[in-house]
A protein has these predicted regions:
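Surface-exposed, charge/polar-rich loops and edge strands
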Residues: 1-425
Length: 425
């Protein structure tokens, strides 16, 4: 059973200035360059909360939120509501619209078979977000989930609220238009609650924050007089149907910083893959991946050289898979890349985030980072479909870290949820 509740969102007021100068990408998508650009836009830019530059960043975030509330830069809505959130965007020349609901969603242990992860997580980001939650006592960014609704029940309910005037309309620096409607009508809220109560959820973005929220919830239960309505039992969540036409998944390309691709590596790769030399350009790499969608194919780029790889035989690599997962999972590109190329051919061992491995969404950014010397070699992939992610998660299986990139991310700074000990939902 999925328990969702309306909540009183904390939002920027007009006193803060133009919203386009305040909102940001999620904290883990903000590069150092973006961080400084966000800081320059406004003294109230949300990056100053989710990714402060100070050494005592958790305390700095806590003080900013407190001061901004006192100064009227931020204010809590008078009435509890759910929020209909629509994003209009273009990717690879195609235009999409994605609509979901932002609500407080009860936190469930994974053993309860209500919420399913689909990726392995890193420990460091989980500790970072837990420290932030302890300091600020707010959900600063939503966790994103998908659920199955083939009959379109939620879309029909949401259409009833579509006539309301939006409380937020803003376009971000990436060209994504964000629109938020406030739904305080308890009849509509009740209809959504009834639809969601028999659903299960798959995390699409925010695995680290979800696991941090579970730990924070348990800490608060151990140290406060809590009830099932205590806000820290919930997390601000963005819920979208996996049948939503605008549910777009992009690949996450892998860049290795300490491994150099040698002729010996290429020889060993040839044991398992057909290798085709490619023109070392973004367009040639993207054309190769597009032409080989539906096959197990990779592009490899290393300063001035590029190759296309297609798998010769699944039977040949079967002994190299280390995890006890289903055949469907073992046949995914990200799993083959990890088990065969990284673990067997390159013998990379444990890859530490930032030190050993980097991730990029766009081909051009991956190529540029190799050309700049920030990484030695890039492995570029095709995306995984949302239906595949759904099936694998329901089997209690996890993909390698950063296997998917549900695009676009929800904007940070639109809505905040209070999870102070005294807050009830």
């Amino acid at each position: 059973m999925v328990d969702i509740r309306p909540f009183r969102a904390i939002r920027y007021t007009a006193k803060a200035g133009e919203l386009e100068n305040l909102i940001t990408q999620p904290y883990d998508k903000i590069t150092p360059q973006m961080q400084w650009e966000y800081y320059a836009r406004s003294p109230y830019n949300y990056c100053r909360v989710i990714l402060p530059t100070e050494k005592n960043r958790y305390e700095a975030a806590q003080q900013r939120v407190r001061n901004w509330l006192l100064e009227g830069i931020l204010a809590k809505d008078e009435a509890a509501a759910v929020y209909v959130y629509t994003q209009a965007f273009t990717v690879n020349g195609e235009t999409y619209t994605r609509t979901g609901v932002v609500a407080a969603c009860r936190l469930y242990d994974f053993s309860e078979n209500t919420v399913f992860p689909h990726e392995v997580t890193y420990n460091m980001p989980k500790q970072d977000r837990l420290n932030m939650m302890r300091a600020v006592k707010k959900n600063l960014e939503p966790i994103s989930f998908m659920y199955s609704d083939p009959e379109g029940k939620t879309r029909r309910v949401l259409s009833e609220a579509a006539s309301a005037a939006p409380i937020i309309t803003v376009q971000d620096s990436f060209g994504v238009k964000h629109t938020v409607l406030q739904v305080a009508d308890m009849n509509v809220v009740s209809s959504l609650q009834k639809i969601m109560q028999d659903k299960t959820l798959v995390i699409t973005d925010g695995h680290h924050r979800y696991e941090s929220a579970l730990k924070y919830r348990d800490e608060m239960r151990a140290s406060t007089n809590w009830t099932w309505d205590s806000a820290f039992n919930f997390h601000m969540s963005y819920l979208v149907s996996c049948q939503e036409p605008g549910l777009v998944v992009l690949p996450t390309h892998r860049l290795l910083r300490r491994v150099t691709l040698t002729t010996e590596h290429l020889s060993r790769l040839h044991m398992f893959f057909n290798i085709l030399p490619l023109e070392p350009s973004v367009s040639a790499i993207e054309a190769y991946l597009a032409a080989n969608r539906g096959r197990n194919a990779f592009a490899v780029y290393t300063r001035g050289k590029a190759y296309g790889l297609t798998l010769k035989s699944h039977a040949q690599i079967a002994p190299l898979h280390t995890s006890n997962t289903s055949e469907e999972t073992r046949k995914l590109d990200v799993v083959i890349l990890r088990d065969v190329i990284f673990n067997h051919v390159l013998n990379t061992g444990v890859l530490n985030l930032d030190e050993d491995i980097l991730y990029e969404r766009w081909t051009k950014d991956a190529v540029n980072r190799v050309d700049s010397g920030d990484a030695n070699v890039a492995f570029l992939l095709n995306p995984i479909g949302p239906e595949t992610v759904w099936r694998i998660a329901q089997k209690h299986e996890r993909l390698p870290e950063k296997s998917t990139d549900f695009y676009p991310k929800t904007a940070s700074g639109l809505l905040i949820m209070d999870i102070s000990p005294e807050e009830k939902l």
